[in-house]
């Protein structure tokens, strides 16, 4: 019986159910709108820890991240959402009413600003899910990382815009899309994001050296059995 529950089809089905459950919790968490930042942060945290690393339970880990990061995530969300909204409205108005080369240049700048702000959103909530930092520090880190990892930023922007396009084109199937896509999208993002975040994760302190009076054999045993944080596994 144990082999049955450990078989690949059963494991995959269990993960699929967890992803559906995570999507439902995420969508409910987004209803007040101002909580979207905390929900996004908790979604990323839970996807990586529970779905990818098999650590913890969906509801417990989601709730933990949502509560712990609520204040900073809400601040980041409000700032970036307002900026994104202003740039979107400006771009739309210029496309409808703008004429001439100057308008074209402004449209280009507005669109570039819109995409860069979107990139900051993608990075900001992932950073917040991993590190303890305030809203200002989160945005600063997101700006730095999005520029420093330009190739990965482009990939994740394409993925994000592709999902948005899918939602707009398949609006008739929106309930099904929303039930499946959020966690699937976050998992795809995490494949790139985790490789980036690990570069900024402080190394664990080494166990003790021989100079500290510890027997080398004991030190090797301690190193071998030392528990690593789940995100370093």
Regions found by a protein language model. Name each.
Residues 1-97, 101-106, 110, 120-122, ...:
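Helix-coil boundary and N-terminal low-complexity module in membrane systems
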Residues 116-117:
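Faces of alpha-helical transmembrane segments in polytopic inner-membrane proteins
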């Amino acid at each position: 019986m144990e082999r049955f529950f450990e078989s690949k089809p059963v494991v995959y089905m269990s993960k699929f159910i967890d992803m559906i459950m995570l999507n439902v919790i995420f969508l409910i968490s987004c209803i007040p709108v101002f909580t979207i930042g905390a929900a996004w942060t908790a979604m990323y945290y839970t996807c990586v820890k529970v779905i990818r690393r098999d650590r913890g339970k969906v509801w417990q880990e989601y709730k933990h991240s949502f509560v712990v990061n609520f204040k900073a995530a809400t601040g980041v969300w409000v700032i970036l959402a307002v900026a994104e909204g202003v740039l979107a409205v400006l771009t739309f108005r210029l496309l409808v009413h703008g004429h001439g080369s100057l308008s074209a240049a402004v449209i280009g700048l507005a669109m570039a600003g819109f995409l860069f702000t979107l990139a900051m959103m993608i990075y900001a909530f992932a950073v917040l899910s991993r590190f303890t930092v305030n809203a200002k520090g989160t945005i600063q880190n997101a700006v730095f990382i999005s520029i420093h990892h330009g190739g990965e930023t482009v990939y994740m922007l394409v993925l994000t815009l592709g999902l948005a396009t899918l939602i707009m084109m398949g609006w008739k199937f929106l309930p099904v899309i929303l039930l499946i896509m959020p966690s699937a999208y976050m998992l795809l993002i995490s494949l790139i994001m985790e490789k980036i975040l690990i570069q900024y994760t402080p190394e664990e302190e080494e166990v003790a050296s021989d100079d500290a009076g510890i027997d080398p054999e004991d030190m090797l045993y301690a190193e071998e059995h030392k528990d690593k944080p789940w995100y370093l596994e």
